[in-house]
Amino acid sequence: RTWLRIDFDGIRCVWCPLDCFFGAGTGAPASSNWYVSSDGKGTFTSRWVMPYAEHADLRLEKRTDIPFTAVITGYVDDFDWTAQTLYFHATYHDETSIPVNNDYNSPDNLDWNFTTITGRGVYCGDVLSLYNHCPDWYGEGDEKIWIDNDTFPSFMGTGTEDYYNCSWAPVVPFATPFGGAPRADEASSHGYNTFVRTRNLDVIPFGQRLQFDLEMLSWNPGAVDYRAAAFWYGTAASAATEKN
């Protein structure tokens, strides 16, 4: 319930709950990744490079009555800002009671929008933290990423487990330098799950627009609650969908 806001040169670029920003998700369990990590005890680390031309403003917003003490350490170095330099962004989107369907051929199946970014930029990773109300696997639908003026997705995957480098639904938490599942409450996939992926070697550049959707297909019909954080670089004019 604590949010991180960072403004670079007067532009709000980071607006995200702490647990998702640092790749841990709901409950903030231990998580280790090339760019973000959590020790599960309240210490978080981010290693994203966040350039700015003149000034940065970092704030924590507490959305709870529970008091806490925060110590923030930042590392700053010289940077040669040019006309091509992009700002780091972390944007957040959540929704509850999203329907999932096990009729894979139904024309009514939902494509849930993870994020849509307008303007020029580079997509670098994301976190999906969720509660699954279904008794078992909920992420059978394809992930779809459209770039600029695509009429068909440039990236068309085969399910949430493959997008997040699991190859099947995670039955225990695991971590790799590029992704993982910090939280997997039950082997059945019921309950809380969290996934993280950072695109260390496979960032996605775009010139005008990027749209990332997840097809909502499952083994059994039901509903899920999704919290989605996206990490990307963009110009001062670039913007992403936010719903929270």
Regions found by a protein language model. Give the residues of each.
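Beta-strand-centric surfaces of beta-sandwich/beta-rich domains
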Residues: 1-244
